[in-house]
Amino acid sequence: MDNNFLKYLSTAPVLLTIWLSFTAALVIEANRFYPDMLYFPI
């Protein structure tokens, strides 16, 4: 049971979903604290 669950967690779609959720949360929180950081007017 535990081995199958760990094997499921290590599949590519699950890892991709977890990684994209983490990245999105990081960008959203950075944008909340520093709102003008996401674009650089050059």
Swiss-Prot record:
Which Gene Ontology terms of cellular component type are present? chloroplast thylakoid membrane; photosystem I
Keyword Transmembrane helix carried by entry: yes
One biological process GO term for this chain?
Answer: photosynthesis
Report the coiled-coil segments.
none
Q: Which compartments is it annotated to reside in?
A: Plastid, Chloroplast thylakoid membrane
Topology with regard to the membrane?
Single-pass membrane protein
Residue pairs linked by disulfide bridges in the UniProt entry: none
Q: SUPFAM superfamilies per the record?
A: Subunit IX of photosystem I reaction centre, PsaJ
Residue ranges spanning the membrane: these are 8-28
Keyword terms of this UniProt record:
Chloroplast, Membrane, Photosynthesis, Photosystem I, Plastid, Thylakoid, Transmembrane, Transmembrane helix
Question: What does this gene product do?
Answer: May help in the organization of the PsaE and PsaF subunits.
UniProt family annotation: Belongs to the PsaJ family.
Protein name listed in UniProt: Photosystem I reaction center subunit IX
Q: Which gene encodes it?
A: psaJ
